[in-house]
């Protein structure tokens, strides 16, 4: 369930940030900020649904999923194929996020 929450959080965070990017860098109209802000608020709320006692650990584990989702966005939305360094870096980050998420704690 955590991965599903992380996936939705990433979608809303990336979409929200892209709205700001589109306004500032692509010169889209200022009204792009309204759905961007709603999307970022949904991102923040959804991340609170992760069953965890520590916000920082949740955010750190989520970081790996965010990187993977960002590269998917790069490929599917921006039509730019991730290169070997993108993929290698993402794999390293996912390994770290998995360690944070699944480490035995007691």
UniProtKB/Swiss-Prot annotation:
**Which superkingdom is the protein from?**
Bacteria
* GO CC terms of this entry: plasma membrane
Q: Is Cell inner membrane tagged as a keyword? A: yes
How does it sit in the bilayer? Multi-pass membrane protein
| Keyword annotations from UniProtKB, A to Z | Cell inner membrane, Cell membrane, Membrane, Transmembrane, Transmembrane helix
As for subcellular location, the record says: Cell inner membrane
What's the chief localization of this chain? membrane
Q: Which Pfam families match?
A: UPF0060
Transmembrane spans: 4-24, 30-50, 58-78, 86-106
The reply on keyword Flavoprotein is no
PANTHER family, alphabetically?
UPF0060 MEMBRANE PROTEIN YNFA
HAMAP family tied to this protein: UPF0060
What is stated as this protein's family in its record?
Belongs to the UPF0060 family.
Name recorded for this polypeptide:
UPF0060 membrane protein RL1530
């Amino acid at each position: 369930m955590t991965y599903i929450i992380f996936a939705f959080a990433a979608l809303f965070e990336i979409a929200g940030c892209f709205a700001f990017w589109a306004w500032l860098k692509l010169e889209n109209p200022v009204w792009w900020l309204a759905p961007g802000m709603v999307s970022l608020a949904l991102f923040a709320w959804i991340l609170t649904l992760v069953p965890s006692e520590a916000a920082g650990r949740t955010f750190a584990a989520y970081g790996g999923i965010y990187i993977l989702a960002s590269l998917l966005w790069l490929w599917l939305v921006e039509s730019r194929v991730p290169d070997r360094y993108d993929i290698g870096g993402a794999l390293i980050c996912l390994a770290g996020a998995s360690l944070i998420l699944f480490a035995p704690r007691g």
